């Protein structure tokens, strides 16, 4: 393995990476923590971007597995070329499936399959902020904290937050000061 860890999901991903032959392709279902976990997770993600073409991540909705609340993704990658860009399809935000009444069926993924095959971005911050298909360059991913692949842009209920990280931090600081002042009174 690339790195020792007791995390079974990370070990499974490492196993898949090592077993794949040059030119081989894989689609692996993994929980969210693989996308953002620090330490071994970050090391494995960097290796995945460097030695493989991680070209697509499909964010799955909750309710499709027997264990309730499981958040999972499908990582699509091939061995041989480094990653240049990653396409994300958010099939989680505002999507509800259950095993009993609204099962995930093939036709629910028709839009994803079309986007996957055509590689035309549907997200546009001005004209279509709810677009579920969006790409990021590998440089944008590497610049993220811990090389996190846990990316969302569609807000629950259709709200899109376009603020920068600096604006968000300033807002949090301002609200924190307001709360501190209120508590002190």
What are these regions (language model features)?
Residues 1-185:
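A conserved structural/catalytic subdomain of Rossmann-like adenosyl-cofactor enzymes
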């Amino acid at each position: 393995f690339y790195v020792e860890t007791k995390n079974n999901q990370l070990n499974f991903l490492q196993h898949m990476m090592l077993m794949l032959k040059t030119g081989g392709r894989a689609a692996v279902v993994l929980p969210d923590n693989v996308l953002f976990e620090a330490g071994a997770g970050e090391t494995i993600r960097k290796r995945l971007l460097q030695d493989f073409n991680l070209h697509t991540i499909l964010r799955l909705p909750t309710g499709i597995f027997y264990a309730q609340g499981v958040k999972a993704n499908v990582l699509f990658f091939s061995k041989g070329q480094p990653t240049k860009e990653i396409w994300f399809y958010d099939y989680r935000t505002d999507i509800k499936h259950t095993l009993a009444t609204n099962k995930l069926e093939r036709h629910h993924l028709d839009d994803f399959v079309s986007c996957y095959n055509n590689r035309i971005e549907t997200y546009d911050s001005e004209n279509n902020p709810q677009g579920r298909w969006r790409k990021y360059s590998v440089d944008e991913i590497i610049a993220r904290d811990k090389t996190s692949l846990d990316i969302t842009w569609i807000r629950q209920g259709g709200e899109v937050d376009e603020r920068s990280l600096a604006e968000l931090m300033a807002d949090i600081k301002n609200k924190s000061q307001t709360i501190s002042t209120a508590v002190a009174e």
